[in-house]
Every structure is written in C-alpha cells, then in structure tokens.
C-alpha cells in the first residue's frame, strides 16, 4: 500500500477538502447562473428553435467529454492542483465570451456563435476542475474516503445549481445578460484565489494503462451514471421553457428544489456508499429519480412540478458517489484521475446527447414528454445496474 492509501481523515485534511469544495461551488456558479437563462436567451431573444436550445446547452458537455482524457492525464502526471486551478481560469474565460455576446452590436448568428464558444470553453474548464478536485481530494484524505470526497464535491456542484438558477434569472431580469456574464467571469477568479494555498498532493508514479483499458474497467458504473444523467439534463435544459409554456412562475426555483434536495441527501446520507457499497444505494436512488420525473411529466400545477424536481434531485444525489465507489475499487492508484475523468465523461455524454434529442422530442410531443423520457432512462438504469453487477 502507498502512503496515500493509508491516510486517515484529519481536521486539517477536512478543512482543505472544504476549501476545495467551496472553490468548486464558486466556480460551478458559472454553470448554475446561466443554466435557466440560456434557453430563454436563445429561444426568446435570439429567436431560435428548441433544438438549437438543446445544442446551446448540450454542447458544453461534449467539450467536457472530449477533454476528460486530457484532464485525467494532467491530474495524474502533473498534479491535481494544477488541473483544478487551470479549470477555474478557463471557466472565467467562458464568462468573457458571453459578455462579448451580450455587448457586441452584431447579428443573432454571431451572438449565438459567441455563446457556443463560451459553452465550449466552459466544458473544457469543467473537465479540468472536477477531475482535478476529485483527484486532489482523494490525495488529501485517502481512497477509503472516496465517497466523502465525491459527496462534498457533489454538494458544491448542486448547491451552486440550487443557488445559481433563481439568482441567474433575477440578475437577467433586472440587469440583463451582460451583468450575468460579468458575474460568471469574476466568480472563478475568486475561487482560484481561495484555493491557491491548499497544499499539493504528489502525482502518482507507476505503469499507466491505456485509456481504453481503463474504460474497460469502469464502463459498467459509467453506463448506470449516464442513464441517470438524462433526468437532470431534461430538467436543466427545458424546465424554464416548460414553466413558461404553462404560464407558471417560479421556474428558477425548480433547480433550487432539485439542488436543495440533492445537497440535503448528500449531507444526511452521503456516508451510505462507503458503508453499504454502491450498487444498493444506486438502485434505490434511481427509483426515487424515476418517481420525481414521472411527477414532472404529469404535473398539473407548478407546486407539483417543484415536488417532482425535488424528488428527482434526491434520487440523483447519491448515484455519482455510489457508482464512483465501485470505480475507485476497480483501478490502480496511478490512474485514478483518468478513471474518475472517464467515469464522469459518461454523464457528460448523457447531458450532451440528451439536449438536442430532447429538443426534437419537445417540438414533436410537447415539453412534458422529455420528463417521461428521463423516467424511462432511469428505469433502464436500474436494470442495467442490477444485471451488470450481478454478472460482474
């Protein structure tokens, strides 16, 4: 065993882990603040279709997928801290691209192109940020606390979504898209300053298997994660348009309900994957997610939709750490960054594919249909998880 694998959690390590997670919260506001606003900006201000809305939201995740391998190698070979800080700076640059889209006196296609550039930069930054912070956290507290590391980072991410969605709509409605873009440009720089003095963890040495051999070890939990991700993708992409189409207010608070329930589950039950193993926790979580998405599909009122969003958030909450525990068990220490990056890439692919496909579904069958599609995906995720791990 390496020295790192023998580490136990100390107060100083916990405080460093908190600082990393808080910096993730600040940086991930670059995702949370614009998430409910971009569909409105693309559809209402630029005049594009639901499919183009899906592309504008989903393309970020394709950029994340394509750079996960680079982020994992960067964290494994040159240090997780470098990966995380580099990701924060890239997320700040995304806000600069959106600021240009808001301020330049150019045509709608050019504004849309600048928006897409910002989304691509954000995807590049997100892959480095999350892969770096997960690997950094594991180096600080040790792999036996992998569920804790993933839970704290997840709380930061979805806390940023919960706080960012209504705040983003508020900033946009009162001050416009330029103010929103400027805010997203500044927050990652604050996160970078907050994390600058957290100690490095050494890069691992040893033989490094190829990326494809690592994927061969993690594809089963990755597939379960991808099927879970459809639910969040349809909420993040179409919930604001769903509410507007029904004449409901409080669209931003659906992501608050989702993110709040997500964080609460992590706080109360984030220890479960380390204690009981990932598979049982993942199956129960997918059942809860299914119930929430079915409520959103059938919701007669805004309040029922909010309950559905909260249930979906509660269901999604523990799936990443639950199946992530299985990933950490399967790979050697020197490729944990690559493995975690590849694992998260399954979710990114899900987010990226879901956006445009759900956009076509919404155009043909209405916005409720996308939530039914999410529920069906979660049910398939239950079956895949049970069958894969029973055979594995």
UniProtKB/Swiss-Prot annotation:
InterPro entries: MFS, MFS_dom, MFS_trans_sf, MFS_Transporters, MFS_YfcJ. GO terms for molecular function: transmembrane transporter activity. CDD domains: MFS_YfcJ_like. Gene3D superfamilies: MFS general substrate transporter like domains. The chain crosses the membrane at residues 22-42, 46-66, 97-117, 121-141, 151-171, 174-194, 224-244, 252-272, 276-298, 342-362, 369-389. Its main location: membrane. Keywords: Cell inner membrane, Cell membrane, Membrane, Transmembrane, Transmembrane helix, Transport. GO terms for cellular component: plasma membrane. It is a multi-pass membrane protein. It is found in: Cell inner membrane. Pfam families: MFS_1. It comes from the Bacteria. The keyword Transport applies. Belongs to the major facilitator superfamily. YfcJ family. This is Uncharacterized MFS-type transporter YfcJ. It comes from Salmonella typhimurium (strain LT2 / SGSC1412 / ATCC 700720).
